[in-house]
Amino acid sequence: MNVQIEESWRQRLQPEFDKDYFRTLTDFVRSEYAHGPVYPPGRLIFNAFNLCPFDQVKVVLIGQDPYHEPGQAQGLCFSVNEGVPFPPSLVNIFKEIKNDIGTDVPTSGSLVRWAQQGILLLNATLTVRAHQAGSHQGRGWETFTDAVIRILADEREHLVFLLWGAYAQRKGNFIDPNRHLLLASPHPSPLSASRGFFGNKHFSRTNEYLRLHGKQPIVW
């Protein structure tokens, strides 16, 4: 499995890599890649970390699974490759950004530019079998990404955690709200966006908090 992880993350996550559950997870993921299409491509499994070193993280956006259709997943939650049509949740994210801060909807659904500005675009599960949503859940990725969130919450201060939907909110339930800003709302999925994702103003609120703590705001 051809994966790399950025050095500042490797230093902090090495204790996780050395645990039995992660070795078991690695064996499972290698077997999956050997026997059929799995997304994202192996070299992009840790893309969220490679594009956003530990000390540069300002915002953490928690997703659930990678996209499971060909050509979509690039190792960043909610993001798709250049030229790929926007999935419905991403359409709604861009719609809320436009309504919140007036930024026009971009031509690309790639959120690499967000990652490069300090947004960790973290899926709870980092791989998925083609055409089978949730197929790699319960194999150990959730334990690993819980550790990522805990390390950030404990070692850093004044981060913004964007928790969209009940799954992400459960994932963030141990974060100290006195140390970080937790912004929770329904998920941007068409099934729930009208129940409180639209109008949540999370993008302007994120930037207000970053400015308050002397950090550069995000160019959404």
Question: Where are the predicted features?
Answer:
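C-terminal substrate-binding/active-site "lid" region of AdoMet-derived donor-dependent transferases
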Residues: 197
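Generic N-terminal amphipathic, Lys/Arg-enriched alpha-helix
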Residues: 1-13
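A polyanion-binding, active-site-adjacent surface
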Residues: 3, 15-163, 167-170, 175, ...
